UniProtKB/Swiss-Prot annotation:
Protein name: Large ribosomal subunit protein uL3
Gene name of the record: rplC
A GO BP annotation: translation
Annotated family: Belongs to the universal ribosomal protein uL3 family.
Quaternary structure annotation from Swiss-Prot or TrEMBL: Part of the 50S ribosomal subunit. Forms a cluster with proteins L14 and L19.
InterPro entries listed in its UniProt record: Ribosomal_uL3 (IPR000597), Ribosomal_uL3_bac/org-type (IPR019927), Ribosomal_uL3_CS (IPR019926), Transl_B-barrel_sf (IPR009000)
Entry keywords, A to Z: Ribonucleoprotein, Ribosomal protein, RNA-binding, rRNA-binding
Origin: domain of life: Bacteria
Length: 210
C-alpha cells in the first residue's frame, strides 16, 4: 500500500555495516504526522490523505485555516501535504503516523526543495565552458551567442544566466538504512535535496528496484 510521511532534514553522517563498510546516510526527522483530511474517489475523484506536520503558533493562521483544523479536531500544524493512498478508509482523521511505517531495507523516494543559489551565470548554472583566457580575448565567462541571426529572436528554453536552485527535486530509490521509532528518525542512504531543517516528503518508491 502506498504510504508517505513529512519530515525535516537533520543532516548527513555515516553508518558502519557489520563488515566495516562506511555508508553515507541522511538523517531525517520523519513525523509524527497527523491525518487532517481524507480524499475519496466518490467525493474528490481520487484517493489521498492530507498530512500535517510541525508546530506553529495559532495566531499565525488566518480564520479559514483555523476552521480547517477545527473541523478535523486537530491542533494547527505548520505544513500540509497530500499523499496518494489506495484505501483512505484505513486511516482516521486525527490519527498519528510515525516513522515506524518504514522498515530498514525498504526503498523510498524523497522530495525536497534544493538550496537557493541566487542569480548565477551560465558556467555555474548550466556547466558552460569558459572563453579563452588569453590577453586578447573579449570575453571569459559570458554566455556567448544567443542563436542565429535569421529568426531575429531568442528561442524559448535558451540556457542563460538566471536564478539557480529553490526547485522541487525528487530523489528516487533511496534505501532506508535505519529506523529509530522512539525518536522518529530515518537514516536513508545517500543525499537528500535541501538545507538542514528543510521540509522533505518521504514516499514509498514508485519505481522500486533491487
Amino acid at each position: 500500500m502506498p504510504k508517505g510521511l513529512l519530515g525535516k532534514k537533520v543532516g548527513m553522517t555515516q553508518i558502519f555495516t557489520d563488515t566495516g563498510l562506511a555508508v553515507p546516510v541522511t538523517v531525517i526527522e520523519a513525523g509524527p504526522c497527523i491525518v487532517v483530511q481524507k480524499k475519496t474517489p466518490e467525493k474528490d475523484g481520487y484517493s489521498a490523505i492530507q498530512l500535517g506536520f510541525g508546530a506553529k503558533k495559532e495566531r499565525s493562521f488566518n480564520k479559514p485555516m483555523l476552521g480547517h483544523f477545527l473541523a478535523a479536531r486537530v491542533r494547527p500544524l505548520r505544513y500540509l501535504r497530500e499523499v496518494r493512498v489506495e484505501n483512505p478508509e484505513t486511516y482516521q482523521v486525527g490519527q498519528e503516523i510515525k516513522a515506524d511505517i518504514f522498515a530498514p531495507g525498504e526503498k523510498v523516494d524523497v522530495v525536497g526543495t534544493t538550496k537557493g543559489r541566487g542569480f548565477a551565470g551560465g558556467i555555474k548554472r548550466h556547466g558552460f565552458h569558459r572563453g579563452p583566457m588569453a590577453h586578447g580575448s573579449k570575453y571569459h565567462r559570458r554566455p556567448g551567442s544567443l542563436g542565429a541571426k535569421g529568426p531575429a529572436r531568442v528561442f524559448k528554453g535558451r540556457r542563460l544566466p538566471g536564478h539557480l536552485g529553490m526547485e522541487r527535486v525528487t530523489v528516487q530509490n533511496l534505501e532506508v538504512v535505519k529506523v529509530d521509532a522512539d525518536r522518529n528518525l530515518l537514516a536513508v542512504k545517500g543525499a537528500v535535496p535541501g538545507p538542514k531543517g528543510g521540509l522533505v516528503l518521504i514516499k514509498q518508491a514508485a519505481k522500486a528496484r533491487g
